[in-house]
A protein has these predicted regions:
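N-terminal pre-Walker A segment at the start of P-loop NTPase domains
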Residues: 1-15
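Hydrophobic anchor at the beta1->P-loop junction of P-loop NTPases
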Residues: 26
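Conserved lysine of the Walker
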Residues: 34
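Hydrophobic positions on the alpha1 helix immediately C-terminal to the Walker A/P-loop
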Residues: 37, 41
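Short glycine-rich substrate-engagement loop in P-loop NTPases that contacts/grips substrate
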Residues: 56-89
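Structural recognition of the conserved hydrophobic beta-strand(s) that form the central parallel beta-sheet
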Residues: 118-124, 145
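Interdomain motor-coupling "hinge/lid" segment immediately C-terminal to the ATP-binding subdomain
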Residues: 132-254
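Accessory nucleic acid-recognition modules appended to NTPase machines
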Residues: 199, 204-379
Length: 449
């Protein structure tokens, strides 16, 4: 089976080399490749790998019966399976499906103190168990959050190397337009990524076949699996509410005003009744929440209204798959999704920002037409980010930059179908450069220091 190179690969290697490393918890949505990446790393770096999957082998939930000390847990694992070999300094213990047995997180402190074996846990943050994991292991773990493939990892899967990606970043930093061939190649690759998304099963199938055949079916199976997870892990009556919110995301993104309106989900629905449902979907890694700023100024944290927000899919390919039967074909053939076109590009850029480490914020002033898609920040500036599905003047972006009201804003970023450019303090880049924004801004900051 084709292995997809992931960013976690380099992180795992660095983690192993750290002499003072803590047990590692790899979190992330279902089916984004956590187990596969960890198992590959383990096989290449350890003499012995002890894999405990709490879903496939629930009997291992008994290993804490005598307490949480490393020696007691190792003894109980050996009682269940005497063939497992624990070799000091050469063994990785891999606890998979952590959400099924969050109790094991309590043992991480004792494995850190013991120090003889490396420990990695992996789990999907479904239901309330992730909070139990946090409280059980605070101070004695390292966290890594994994997502579906970003566009850079998608390029790796297609055989493009770091030099290709570095060249894209150079175009941004030097404000050098891409030539016709580069625009065509990068644009087609990005369109493929928009259609497919980054779920490993979908990307692998596309790379191996070289066509979109079967991709829609795979995406829809993933959506079906997500719905089943909601039914399995969500409590009681929240199941129906969570499913209703999940189903309504594409419809609400198609509106001119993309603010998510709970009142559209069910008759008489109120935010306070659905707040936990929104948080559940976000914590499970199924959606990204974009909160409305009270005012576009620093700092961002605490400066937003939690009752006003947009909901984006954490993987844009799943958004496409939830549209009508012709959506994928229409996007490939006509490059046109009608009312959904703007929603798709917003979703893809928002997804890229989250995968780069940003939290999502937007701004809409109630008494005017002023509205801005996203905001990111550097150490000293607030940067509005515009996503234009069609060529336009970006009036809100210009207002934010030129008005004296917004002291933290000095320039803006616009992502479009067009080429690299700069005018009136607005930097314009193609959509396919969105994944590089954080690196671009880091370079801008270092030049000013």
């Amino acid at each position: 089976m084709l292995y997809l190179k992931r960013k976690i690969d380099a992180f795992l290697s660095e983690w192993k080399e750290n002499p003072d490393k803590k047990p590692l918890i790899v979190k992330g949505p279902r089916q984004v490749g956590k187990t596969e990446s960890i198992q590959r790393f383990a096989a290449e770096n350890y003499t012995s790998v002890i894999t405990i999957n709490f879903v496939e082998e629930p009997k291992y939930k008994m290993i804490t019966a005598d307490g949480y000390k490393a020696a007691d847990i190792i003894k109980n694992i050996s009682r269940i399976d005497p063939s497992k070999r624990f070799i000091e300094d050469e063994t990785l213990i891999f606890f998979d499906e952590l959400q099924e047995f969050p109790d094991i997180a309590t043992a991480l402190k004792f494995f850190k103190i013991d120090g003889r074996f490396d420990v990695i846990c992996s789990g999907s943050m479904l239901g309330l168990n992730y909070r139990k994991i946090e409280s059980n292991s605070v101070g004695y773990k390292t966290d890594y959050e994994m997502f579906s493939l970003d566009f850079e990892e998608f390029l790796w899967a297609g055989g493009y190397d770091d030099a290709f990606i570095d060249d894209m970043l150079t175009h941004m930093r030097t404000l050098t337009p891409f030539n016709e061939l580069e625009m065509s190649v990068c644009g087609e690759l990005f369109l493929n990524y928009c259609i497919l998304g980054g779920m490993p099963a979908v990307v692998r199938e596309f790379i191996e076949k070289g066509t979109f055949e079967g991709s829609l079916e795979t995406q829809r199976q993933l959506i079906s699996d997500y719905r089943e997870d909601i039914r399995k892990y969500a409590d009681g009556m929240d199941q129906t509410r969570i499913l209703n919110v999940f189903q309504h995301i594409p419809v609400q993104l198609a509106k001119d005003n993309k603010k998510f309106q709970i009142s559209k989900v069910a008759s008489g629905a109120r935010f306070r009744d659905y707040r936990g449902c929104i948080e559940w979907l976000n914590d499970a890694g199924m959606v990204n929440i974009c909160y409305c700023l009270n005012f576009p100024e620093l700092p961002l944290k605490g400066n937003y209204d939690e009752t006003k927000y947009k909901l984006y899919f954490a993987d844009s390919g799943l958004l496409v798959a939830m549209l009508d039967e012709e959506a994928q074909e229409d996007l490939r053939a006509n490059k046109n999704l009608g009312v959904y076109k703007g929603a798709l590009y917003e979703n893809v850029v928002g997804e890229a920002l989250v995968k780069a480490g940003y939290q999502l914020y937007y701004y809409k002033r109630e008494d005017s037409t002023l509205e801005q898609d996203f905001f990111v920040r550097t150490a000293s500036a607030l940067i509005p980010v515009e996503v234009k599905a069609q060529r336009g003047t970006a009036k809100s972006l210009r207002t934010l930059i030129t008005s004296d009201k917004y002291e933290d804003i000095h320039y803006g970023i616009k992502f479009t179908a067009g080429n690299v450019g700069f005018s009136d303090d607005i930097y314009t880049f193609p959509y396919f450069c969105a994944f590089l924004l954080k690196r671009y801004l880091a370079g801008e900051q270092s030049e000013k220091l």
